[in-house]
């Protein structure tokens, strides 16, 4: 499955522990019997972690160690070896949607006077409204666009998650496979998996934040909340039938994140004004700015009154 070379332990704790080669185990201890041949030692065997079994083989020489892992297999193979295609989108049929979105809250989106629309309804309308320019005259919705960039997802027997996608943002036109060890998974039970992400990609995204006022505080809070998930895995709920799969982040995960990260940002009038101005200047989303402003201003209260929120993707065989 992969190779690893030893390195001195780092004192820099700013970078979270990587997912590791074995899913669910950022650190693995191997009791080995060394075979000595001159200035080199070798070892081989089989072992297991809480989540998988595997074989290993390695060599040790002065100042270096090389370890190769193979035959990695998850103990819980409920999803192993399955490829799921993104659910086709049909604008005329509400159930025929690749996006799973549930949002229940007492507070709605103010539209006119005292009339409020449920936040779930507004978000679904926004996702289905053709706002994204494709070519000179054509526009598509975010939901439509999703189907053009993501084809399917495979849960491999060794715990890797591999997606078939198009890198449309960089002009990609051909379907390609994501690399292994970018995302891994283990099955916790019949309704939950844990997903282990590459922390370097997440840290890079966080470091791209451009505004200084209060952003650093939010980033620090985000890292404090997300760090355990990077090490221990992101809990992801799923519902599986014979021919369908829904994978989503549930209320237990999302609501604390919304209250800690999104609430303080959207309580800042300067941030809201900045977001609205950005939308007004964007040729694709400018026409939504009028709807977005009251929605953004209402969001702190919406978050406070939220009782259920689920966001994810729907797949079919």
Indicate residue ranges for each PLM-predicted region.
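Acidic/polar, low-complexity intrinsically disordered N-terminal segments immediately downstream
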Residues: 1-133, 275-299, 305-317
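Contiguous, well-ordered beta-strand patches that form the walls/edges
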Residues: 2-57, 124-270
